Amino acid sequence: MKKSLIALTLAALPVAAMADVTLYGQVKAGVEVSRTKETVNHVSTKNKTATEIADFGSRIGFKGHEHLSNNLNAIWQVEQNTSVAGTDKGWGTRESFIGLEGGFGKVRAGKLNTALKDNSDSVDPWESSDANASVLQFGKLKRVDERKVSVRYDSPVFAGFSASAQYQPRDNANPEDKHVHDVKTRHSFDLGLNYENSGFFGRYAGTFAKRKVLSDDHLELFNSNTTLGSGVYKDYQAHRLVGGYDANNVLVSVAGQYEGFKADVADAKKNERTEVAVTGGYRMGNVMPRLSYAHGFKAKENGVKQGNSQYNQVIVGADYDFSKRTSALVSAGWLKEGKGGDKTQSTAGLVGLRHKF
């Protein structure tokens, strides 16, 4: 009898050791079609319609915790992209961290979402491939979203209010300069403030960097007709306010965003842009139809407003839930940048499937 009890205890030990580990993820993909029409000096040209099987951001992750003492836990997560097209590789390519959580809130270190990235879902619930994210998602608005190798503190919730603060050291922002420090620091700070009560919510997110590298892709999303080139810019900042209501089958969300930065030279003038977006939806049984609209006001480059830099975007679609885990997706998007005889119009649509586990 004693031997049987010992054997049962030993057999249960691996199960107990793994009890705090959770495997989770999403598999989502479908068919996308897209096309672009460009007008220059009132002469229009269209490219061929592209039709492709596309991954919509499939991912897999492992997370867990260990109880250390009264009201204190060790927490960890490792998450990575896993495209159904087999194009992703590597571990920890998404939010991955280790940290401590207790009555004080939580402190984490690793590759972490910024507050800006965290609050995007409040106004942009859409799915698509990266290639069509600027049409089928608010890709232009979300150009400021990042994950940074950093340390982040999240406060507990007090009467509906919570906050976060995040810091990326200079040698994580620019690892090629480590131990040398030949160039000026590119460390950054991120802040988040949130409020939720009875379905109503308000969220602020901001990022600040004395100097920051901006890529050609980022600058093209900033202004598709930009005169700016990739490189280091100074006094970088981005701010987003999101407010709305999400309860009782109703979703209404409004966002406003500002981004500003200067060339890293003396007496440089600001490059800046202001954008707004709104999303509405109403659940009817298993169906959640939604409609979104975004507008980008004219961008300023070197302090001068850029003609034909404004944009308008519309996304319409619906999710149909087969179950709590599996949903069918359908959406269509339209993006117009510029106006009159000089403009670019992009259209795209998708039909797909999403499964969460």
From Swiss-Prot:
One of its GO terms (cellular component) is pore complex. The keyword Transport applies. GO terms for biological process: monoatomic ion transmembrane transport. Residues 1-19 form the signal peptide. Its main location: membrane. InterPro entries: Gram-neg_bact_OMP (IPR050298), Gram_neg_porin_domain (IPR033900), Porin_dom_sf (IPR023614), Porin_Gram-ve (IPR001702), Porin_Gram-ve_CS (IPR013793), Porin_Neis (IPR002299). PROSITE patterns: GRAM_NEG_PORIN (PS00576). GO terms for molecular function: porin activity. It is found in: Cell outer membrane. It is a multi-pass membrane protein. It holds the Pfam family Porin_1. Keywords: Cell outer membrane, Ion transport, Membrane, Porin, Signal, Transmembrane, Transmembrane beta strand, Transport. It comes from the Bacteria. Belongs to the Gram-negative porin family. PANTHER family: MAJOR OUTER MEMBRANE PROTEIN P.IA, PROTEIN YDDL-RELATED. Serves as a slightly cation selective porin. Homotrimer. This is Major outer membrane protein P.IB. It comes from Neisseria sicca. The lineage of its organism: Bacteria, Pseudomonadati, Pseudomonadota, Betaproteobacteria, Neisseriales.
